[in-house]
From Swiss-Prot:
The gene is aroA. Phosphoenolpyruvate binds at residues 21, 96, 124, 169, 341, 384, 410. Pfam families: EPSP_synthase (PF00275). One of its GO terms (molecular function) is 3-phosphoshikimate 1-carboxyvinyltransferase activity. It comes from Clostridium botulinum (strain Alaska E43 / Type E3). Its EC number is 2.5.1.19. Belongs to the EPSP synthase family. This is 3-phosphoshikimate 1-carboxyvinyltransferase.
């Protein structure tokens, strides 16, 4: 267990935002499903991305890390056709994306697949896939409370009815898979679709790799079978979910110029800009760098988090220091992330002096003038909680003690290097101090 003592103090300088984890998952998968050689550039080797890379290796792709790019020989190439393991084990580590994207993909190959992982991954629901398996006669078994899923059987093309309010990852997983089947398929969305931005990223990546899908207003998707993922040179853009931490730091009167973001991005987490602007912050594009310029006071607002769940922890920090009451609604899905993020946000920020009431599907946040600090807080072993608390420390009255900070390696291993380069003041802390 790693523990940091982090001191108050504003951040100042420039930061290059790491490449988008969401886009990297998609780029690696599309390239690995291809029939030739692809190069993925500007990729960050976080724990989650390593899990997806290793998963695609288990399915037969030959993937090599070069100095400037990730070199991928696709599964459909002649070189890889005999490379797939018939009885394969796919270790997803703690990556929900790896698990939910790869489960249906694994069902296009002969043999059996065993999915394992750690942390809270075994608690994330997979009922959507179990229903498909039951309908198609695919054999599977699992253990409750831990990830140990075994699957044997071939997925067949057809019509699939999926809920849109559980996780968009199920829809993306099926979208990746169905173009490779022999016949045509249709996905029908039976509820309101949450996290549309993630579906847009999936469709965009697949289009870049030559796959055609008809999107009928997110109510249904028409997928032609027998398609081929082409091999391309693919560059990953900067990650808005990570930029959100430094934009909120700017909202709290730091001065961080944020580089390497695509302004016309499809990322759903780009909504952080619109949310902060509603909170009375001005965001400027200065020589292709974003800088948040806070006005005198941040103002409360109502935030629908259904389309941007990953930025809700750090947005909750900003809301804690707004004038008035902020309501963050439609965020019940945050309870089944790396931890129960609604509970973690409320409990840890309240320790610092915030005033947050946790509801089943929402957070009610009454703004306070200052955060006191001077206490021990816990990341809940969740990367986004850890980084949010580090940003919170910059405006506390007293230092904080952050336990289990290493979980940042899941998405942003260099976070504390960047935090330090911007003037963040922290050191390892031992219980004896």
């Amino acid at each position: 267990m790693g523990t940091f003592k982090i001191y108050p103090g504003k951040l100042k300088g420039e930061v290059k935002i790491p490449p988008s984890k969401s886009m990297a998952h998609r780029g690696v998968i599309c390239a690995a499903l291809g029939d030739g050689i692809s190069k993925i550039r500007n990729i960050n080797y976080s724990d989650d991305i390593r899990a997806t890379i290793n998963a695609m290796r288990s399915l037969g792709a030959i993937i090599t890390k070069e100095d400037e790019y990730l070199h991928i020989i696709g599964i459909k190439s002649e070189k890889c056709k005999k490379n797939i393991e018939l009885n394969r084990t796919i270790d997803c580590n703690e990556s929900g994306s790896t698990l939910r994207f790869l489960v249906p993909i694994s069902c296009i190959f002969e043999g059996s697949s065993r999915f394992i992982g750690k942390g809270n991954l075994g608690k994330r629901p997979l009922d959507t896939y179990y229903e498909i398996f039951d309908n198609q006669g695919i054999k599977y078994s699992y253990k409750k409370g831990k990830l140990d899923l075994r699957i044997q059987g071939i997925l067949k093309y057809g019509e699939f009815k999926l809920r849109g309010d559980i996780s968009s990852q199920f829809i993306s997983g099926m979208l990746f898979t169905l173009p490779l089947l022999e016949g045509d398929s249709k996905i029908i969305i039976t509820t309101e679709l949450e996290s549309k931005g993630y579906i847009d990223l999936t469709l965009s990546a697949m289009s870049d790799f030559g796959i055609e899908i008809i999107n009928n207003n997110y109510r249904e998707f028409i997928i032609k079978g027998n398609q081929t993922y082409k091999s391309i040179d693919y560059r990953i853009e900067g990650d808005y979910s990570q930029a959100a931490f430094f934009l909120v730091a700017d909202a709290l009167k730091s001065e961080v110029f944020i580089n390497d973001l695509k302004l016309e991005s499809l990322q759903g987490d780009k909504e952080v800009i619109e949310i902060l602007e509603r909170m009375n912050m001005k965001i400027k594009n200065i020589d292709n760098s974003l800088l948040g310029i806070p006005r005198e006071n941040l103002e409360a607002t109502i935030i629908d988090g259904s389309q941007c769940p990953d930025i809700i922890p750090v947005i909750s920090l900003a809301a804690s220091l707004c004038n008035g009451r902020t309501e963050i609604i439609n965020v019940g899905r945050l309870r089944i992330k790396e931890c129960d993020r609604l509970s973690a946000v409320a409990s840890e920020l309240n320790k610092l002096g915030a005033n947050i009431i946790e509801k089943e599907d929402s957070l009610i946040i009454d703004g306070v003038k200052t955060l006191k600090g001077g206490v021990k807080v816990w990341s809940h072993k969740d990367h986004r909680i850890a980084m949010m608390l580090a940003i919170a420390s910059t405006v506390c009255m007293e230092p904080i003690i952050l336990e289990d900070y290493e979980c940042i390696s899941k998405s942003y291993p260099e976070f504390f290097d960047d935090f330090k380069a911007l003037g963040g003041n922290f050191h390892e802390w031992n219980l004896g101090e």
